[in-house]
Amino acid sequence: MLTPHKIINLQNHFLIAMPALQDPLFKQSVVYICEHNDAGAMGIVINKLVTRCTVETILNNLKIVSPTRDPSVRLDNPVFAGGPLLDDRGFILHTPIKGFGSSVNISSKAMITTSKDILETLGTPNQPKDVLVALGYSGWDKGQLEHELMENTWLTAPANETILFHTPIIDRWRAAAKILGIDIYNIADQTGHA
């Protein structure tokens, strides 16, 4: 049985919002947990977008132009609203590649980078294979996420790179729940405790 004092490690897992969660920031959201320990948790929402913002918009605003830019690489990919904290800072989820100034391995298939040097590789032969650019992150203080799990706010599922990087954005909530064999649309809006 999960108690508020028992810490489970959800790094490299998805948090899947239960249908009853009506907070507009997290309604029908999927959060990829990048870090989880006894001090709290940090993750990136992977299915909410920043309105009218693309990777190219960010590169142009930061005046990042690479001489090795490959015009065949599309930069019109959307930018994700990673969460309400530090929503003016970039958090880039990507397949692991070494050499960036501020990166943390999350798993063997995902890494997060917050340094500007990764932006300079986007659209070049040096960019990581898969990239998800987000502004902001979601965070939980010590015990807060565990409390929300006990309140049935979230489902949890092991993350996979297909949903993280390739599943159409509109389908990610449902696809993440399907990892558990659940059709999220068949779950009641109200939950209770026995």
From Swiss-Prot:
InterPro entries: AlgH-like. GO terms for cellular component: cytosol. SUPFAM superfamilies: VC0467-like. It holds the Pfam family DUF179. Belongs to the UPF0301 (AlgH) family. This is UPF0301 protein BPEN_258.
